[in-house]
Amino acid sequence: MNKVLFLCLVVLCATSAFAAEEEYVERAPVKRALLSCRCEGKTEYGDKWLFHGGCPNNYGYNYKCFMKPGAVCCYPQNGR
């Protein structure tokens, strides 16, 4: 009987470990910039971030230009 209980405990631990692993999915943060902007020479709009030294990570931005005062315009716009 002890072997059966031990086996059930092992199965329960393994199932909970795999279930917890599936819940974690790497995604970009939901919060985005509220303002739109356009860099010189670009036709499409980007996201304007205030008080940032550059574009935030994990948002998929691949181009940026700096604007006045203390703002950065990041491309491409995700989700639009």
From Swiss-Prot:
Family: Belongs to the sea anemone type 3 (BDS) potassium channel toxin family.
Organism: Antheopsis maculata (Sea anemone)
Prosegment residue ranges: 20-30
Subcellular location: Secreted; Nematocyst
Entry keyword set: Cleavage on pair of basic residues, Disulfide bond, Hydroxylation, Nematocyst, Neurotoxin, Secreted, Signal, Toxin
Signal sequence range: 1-19
Post-translational modification Hydroxyproline, affected residues: P56
Protein name: Delta-actitoxin-Amc2a
Keyword flag Signal: yes
Protein origin, superkingdom: Eukaryota
Pfam families reported in the protein's UniProt record: Defensin_4
First-listed, main subcellular location of the protein, grouped into a coarse class: secreted
Keyword Cell division: no
